[in-house]
Amino acid sequence: MTLAAILAQAALFLWFFGCIRTYRIGKALLVEGMGVKSAEFVMLCLFTATAALSWLFPAWGCWPLLGVLIFWIVVQFFCHWYYTIFGATPQKLSGYNECFRNTVHIIPASDKKLIPDLYHILLHALILLNIALTAFRLA
């Protein structure tokens, strides 16, 4: 389980780093990086610091990591999935689709429902995986 947790944390770090530095697959845009002067960079630092704590101090270090991961998934839910499930105003939908218009989508963007792009779907899956593995380490 330790190896799985390390690999999941590394995968999440590398995947989320795309929010700092732009990732492309060929000419296709996966995510546009926002740089180090961004909320994304703060979140990456929080995740990295608490992940390190979880390995340096396993008896208590997993708790801050779990807190950061839960906070992160709640923020992501209200930025993406809340609008997918409950609907978005035309203005929100238009802004979201404009912001992510050039990114890779496995489900095409819609002008009726907010559909997260591939990057965010995988990001959310990795956060959830890390929550599960961290909770398992605490059990």
Q: Which stretches of residues belong to each language-model region?
A:
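Transmembrane alpha-helical segments in integral membrane proteins
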Residues: 119-139
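Alpha-helical transmembrane segments of polytopic membrane proteins
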Residues: 35-47, 76, 116-124
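Membrane-embedded alpha-helical transmembrane segments of multi-pass integral membrane proteins
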Residues: 11-18, 46-50, 68-78, 126-133
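Hydrophobic transmembrane helix segments
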Residues: 10-41, 72-79, 84
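Membrane-interfacial loop-to-transmembrane alpha-helix junctions, especially the N-terminal start
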Residues: 2-8, 35, 61-65
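Individual transmembrane alpha-helices with interfacial aromatic-anchor signatures
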Residues: 99-126
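Juxtamembrane non-transmembrane "cap" segments at the membrane-aqueous interface
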Residues: 80-101
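Juxtamembrane helix-break-helix junctions at the cytosolic face
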Residues: 48-65
